[in-house]
Amino acid sequence: METMASPGKDNYRMKSYKNNALNPEEMRRRREEEGIQLRKQKREQQLFKRRNVELINEEAAMFDSLLMDSYVSSTTGESVITREMVEMLFSDDPDLQLATTQKFRKLLSKEPSPPIDEVINTPGVVDRFVEFLKRNENCTLQFEAAWALTNIASGTSQQTKIVIEAGAVPIFIELLNSDFEDVQEQAVWALGNIAGDSSVCRDYVLNCSILNPLLTLLTKSTRLTMTRNAVWALSNLCRGKNPPPEFAKVSPCLPVLSRLLFSSDSDLLADACWALSYLSDGPNEKIQAVIDSGVCRRLVELLMHNDNKVASPALRAVGNIVTGDDIQTQVILNCSALPCLLHLLSSSKESIRKEACWTISNITAGNRAQIQAVIDANIFPVLIEILQKAEFRTRKEAAWAITNATSGGTPEQIRYLVSLGCIKPLCDLLTVMDSKIVQVALNGLENILRLGEQEGKRSGSGVNPYCGLIEEAYGLDKIEFLQSHENQEIYQKAFDLIEHYFGVEDDDSSLAPQVDETQQQFIFQQPEAPMEGFQL
């Protein structure tokens, strides 16, 4: 990601940081690592595969109950697929072909466990369905065969592979140009299921040249269900990190996604935002392409959407964009993102609060004007409250946001953070078991102590005003304990801080602390301050 940042910018940033241990490269690398971790998490809002399960009307109920009776009997070893069904499927009579394909489709639409394996293990059946896809003179047969194959492809990777190996994908792509909307929509659905299976399947579908016909369909369609399915399929084509899709093969969808962001349909908006979040997840060149498509202002507006399934992927996309360079980050700030992010910090959903903190941490890793913008938006008081009270995974992100600001901020900006009370919650993080966050907290405290040392020299008193605040927060005891930490960087940093800023070590200051497993941190006996106060 560093390649897009100008050398001049990096040199300026290096000089402006008070803490060379947390330089711009480290912060940028951290954003990548954190981003990967966030994107590995399971998303309940979006399914990568969808089965088409019909809503049964009364007229079909009797036939379906008979089918289900035969299906239930198959659990005793009797096959649900009869020899007669297979013979009728291979009949030359179009009416028999249609009726039997419909029977198979109904079986494959049953919840909760359709007999997919039995269907694909019956010789010739899947190939016959694929053959029926080519019957342009019989759109109903095409539709039923496409539906059956869609539900087979909604299963396991092995089941999806059977559909691919039968040669269905190029034919499904041709059917995107069908004159019949039902056939088009079912083809889109099948292709979405196949692309959603794995990066290998996704790339195969892309290499079969799906994008142009899919985008044409998206541009022309006036049917909401069709557009929803097409955007969902498109998001599956953009999804994945190991490896990501070839950007040149998916980036032509950006203008269409830009237009779709103005839909009023929540399902459609959610998948369009997920697609943009995937496309913006990567190096600065990808981020720039997303910015150039003109989506930023609308993405920021969607942060305030009343449906979390839209706000969440919009936040992910905005968060990815601000992992870029300072100029790219500024584009988001110029869209008035900070008031929206402040609003999201009080979301009822913990995952949204966490990602809002993560996004802000990438903004505070920017330049001093960007840190000031976060200050002016009154975000830091809320971040410090989160740092004290939230779930640990959210506290971690808030810690990054505050430490990044102490690393790149001006003396006045750091003093502002101290005035808000950032020292105590940073000291509290010194007892957690996550070594990376202990280092983040130590770096933040070191930046504050370094400023205090400069202020002591400037005032002529030689007294660092922040040493006392850290001692009052029992930070010194915790730093002393960290001198025996198993992580070399942590114990070295703790030793250096005590030696440089606190002078004499107090050997009796701490006994080995207990461990609180539920809070993922160590427990200290808090010593009472001596009557005359702490010695500086």
From Swiss-Prot:
Domain of life from the UniProt record = Eukaryota
Pfam families xref list:
Arm, Arm_3, IBB
What segment(s) does the record annotate as region Disordered? 1-29
Give start and end of each IBB domain.
1-60
Q: Where is this motif: Nuclear localization signal?
A: 45-54
User: Can you quote a single GO CC term?
Assistant: host cell
State the InterPro entries in the record: ARM-like (IPR011989), ARM-type_fold (IPR016024), Arm_3 (IPR032413), Armadillo (IPR000225), Importin-a_IBB (IPR002652), Importin-a_IBB_sf (IPR036975), Importin_alpha (IPR024931)
**According to its UniProt record, in which tissues is this protein expressed?**
Widely expressed.
Note down the stretches annotated as region NLS binding site (major).
147-239
Q: Does the keyword Transit peptide apply?
A: no
GO BP annotations of the record are: entry of viral genome into host nucleus through nuclear pore complex via importin; NLS-bearing protein import into nucleus; positive regulation of viral life cycle
* Sorted UniProt keywords: Acetylation, Phosphoprotein, Protein transport, Repeat, Transport
Q: Where are the ARM repeats?
A: 76-115, 116-159, 160-204, 205-243, 244-288, 289-328, 329-370, 371-410, 411-453, 457-502
Q: PANTHER family this protein is in?
A: IMPORTIN ALPHA
Q: Give the protein family.
A: Belongs to the importin alpha family.
Q: How does it assemble?
A: Forms a complex with importin subunit beta-1. Interacts with ZIC3.
Q: How is this protein named in the record?
A: Importin subunit alpha-7
Species assigned in the record: Bos taurus
